[in-house]
Amino acid sequence: EKIKICLQKQVNSSFSLHNGFGGNLYATEEKRMFELVKPKAGASVLNQSTWIGFGDSRTDKSNPNFPRSADVSVKTANKFRSLTGGSLMLSMFGPPGKVDYLYQGCGKHKVFYEGVNWSPHAAIDCYRKNWTDIKLNFQKNIYELASQSHCMSLVNALDKTIPLQATAGVAGNCNNSFLKNPALYTQKVTPPXXKCGKENLAFFTLPTQFGTYECRLHLVASCYFIYDSKEVYNKRGCDNYFQVIYDSSGKVVGGLDNRVSPYTGNSGDTPTMQCDMIQLKPGRYSVRSSPRFLLMPERSYCFDMKEKGPVTAVQSIWGKDRKSDYAVDQACLSTPGCMLIQKQKPYTGEADDHHGDQEMRELLSGLDYEARCISQSGWVNETSPFTEEYLLPPKFGRCPLAAKEESIPKIPDGLLIPTSGTDTTVTKPKSRIFGIDDLIIGLLFVAIVEAGIGGYLLGSRKESGGGVTKESAEKGFEKIGNDIQILRSSTNIAIEKLNDRISHDEQAIRDLTLEIENARSEALLGELGIIRALLVGNISIGLQESLWELASEITNRAGDLAVEISPGCWIIDNNICDQSCQNFIFKFNETAPVPTIPPLDTKIDLQSDPFYWGSSLGLAITAAISLAALVISGIAICRTK
């Protein structure tokens, strides 16, 4: 007796239909192309080999109480340049009796966890009761220059020329000593004949190199005394006070000149010292000061200005019973590109009240790892391009964009059944897939024509079923990826130009950045919708091809025992080919001809420039689908007589 045996697609109400370009799919399950990720609080780095830290006892592995005294792991401590009791500002000014450490090192990303050792608790005077405002200005300049440099170093001995009549001086309010920078020089005068002394003229040189460190820019403390009135300074009738720094061309670059600037007008009778932070290029500079007193720059921090990179500043405060300042916090928040790590609770140490805080350890634990994105909101190492909430800038790396979960396209999963057809739901997408409205002029927009996706599918369409070839879909992936790269590059240029135009308005930059991010998210979701449709169509075609491959294999196995009368259907004589024979042909010796479908291997990798500020996302698309490995599920063997 002859019977007809066919491969038949079986789809029931549990399947959902997914439309694609060139073919559709029925599937038992579906999943979002990406899940939303949540940033982890604290600090991390993009690359373990390209960062360096600057710290104090809380990162100092030579501390006798390490690791209990530390807020970082042993691995992270190895990345820090630290000394117990030290701070960048202490090394800059060198107050008597304090730790003086040579801070220097190189790294694209710099993490600063120091500053607490110069705080109100330190009670440093030297003609200034409160140094917090100077510390704020110092830290801000350090963060700014560090973000533009690969290497930085303290220069702890500048070449100088001091006038013969000046000798090193001391001050009673500075432990009967004085700062190492600036150094105090005084003139010995003999009233009444030489009651005023001579004007001071001194020179110092900022080097182009310090050891192995190149110096293209120096941070210098321009210090001078502030008198409340001329009478306070001019008790001997010696004219007005001045202390001025000049560059080699004679231009004033720092200091104070009471010959042209008014005194404070306050009622005090003791001068205070002010130190302005100035950024100077290498070269020879002169210092002129009124007789009797000279404050001479003797140190600087030098920067090579060779590479832009992230800066992370970690809140540096004492535990209970010690007074702290928040200069580090304020300096970082007012410096573009600086990410601030802050505690939510008071500092509570394990080794003592001031060392080994558990909350800070958790916030800094991310320094042991590499992240895909670091930002003020935290760090992310998942590959998803979407997060539930907008990540606060600054941010660097491949940072996810804010999106709603329901807006992320879904792709078919589980049991997949192909069906011919053309997607009718996405043939008219939005007229452009990227845009940040009319604020940005001249951006490249990708137009989507009504007939399809405007040249992305380059192959010829099959007349039967209206689908596209596998090759054309693959070319579509390549072309859409290339076009989006061009789009992102053009956007980069436009954004950078706009940033330059409105750089004076920080709020405008923040507003524009948020708008751009929202547009990027919408654009990416639109792009993913197109990619999803391409994926569905490509898989559908591939599965149908696999069906024909399966039918061909059955025909080959059957030989003369079965005659293929149409694709997927055979006539067989069961008097000649019994059940075991049929099992051999159609079930491969009782082995199911339809093994479980492997997981859909799709990857969409979003890439960006190494750093967030002024950059634009780039989109690299790979859709690696092993068509040869996909075997049709949901196929039944149907017998009819």
From Swiss-Prot:
Any one GO cellular component localisation term in the record: membrane
Transmembrane segments: 617-637
One Pfam assignment: Hema_esterase
Enzyme Commission number: 3.1.1.53
Topological domain ranges for the Extracellular compartment: 1-616
Cytoplasmic side: 638-641
Residue numbers annotated as active site: S57 (nucleophile), D352 (charge relay system), H355 (charge relay system)
Membrane topology note: Single-pass type I membrane protein
UniProt entry tagged with the keyword Transmembrane: yes
Region Esterase domain-1, annotated ranges: 27-137
Compartment(s) where it occurs, according to its Swiss-Prot or TrEMBL record: Virion membrane; Host cell membrane
Keywords: Disulfide bond, Fusion of virus membrane with host endosomal membrane, Fusion of virus membrane with host membrane, Glycoprotein, Hemagglutinin, Host cell membrane, Host membrane, Host-virus interaction, Hydrolase, Membrane, Transmembrane, Transmembrane helix, Viral attachment to host cell, Viral envelope protein, Viral penetration into host cytoplasm, Virion, Virus entry into host cell
Residue segments, region Fusion domain-1: 1-26
Region (Esterase domain-2): 297-351
UniProt-listed GO biological process terms: fusion of virus membrane with host endosome membrane; fusion of virus membrane with host plasma membrane; symbiont entry into host cell; virion attachment to host cell
Annotated segments matching region Fusion domain-2: 352-637
GO molecular function: host cell surface receptor binding; sialate 4-O-acetylesterase activity; sialate 9-O-acetylesterase activity
Gene3D superfamilies documented for this protein: 2.20.70.20, 3.90.20.10
Record PTM: In natural infection, inactive HEF is matured into HEF1 and HEF2 outside the cell by one or more trypsin-like, arginine-specific endoprotease.
Catalyses which reaction(s): N-acetyl-9-O-acetylneuraminate + H2O = N-acetylneuraminate + acetate + H(+); N-acetyl-4-O-acetylneuraminate + H2O = N-acetylneuraminate + acetate + H(+)
Disulfide bond residue pairs: C6-C569, C106-C151, C126-C174, C196-C238, C215-C302, C223-C275, C332-C338
UniProt family annotation: Belongs to the influenza type C/coronaviruses hemagglutinin-esterase family.
Protein's job: Binds to the N-acetyl-9-O-acetylneuraminic acid residues on the cell surface, bringing about the attachment of the virus particle to the cell. Plays a major role in the determination of host range restriction and virulence. Class I viral fusion protein. Responsible for penetration of the virus into the cell cytoplasm by mediating the fusion of the membrane of the endocytosed virus particle with the endosomal membrane. Low pH in endosomes induce an irreversible conformational change in HEF2, releasing the fusion hydrophobic peptide. Several trimers are required to form a competent fusion pore.
Subunit field text: Homotrimer of disulfide-linked HEF1-HEF2.
The name this protein goes by in its record: Hemagglutinin-esterase-fusion glycoprotein
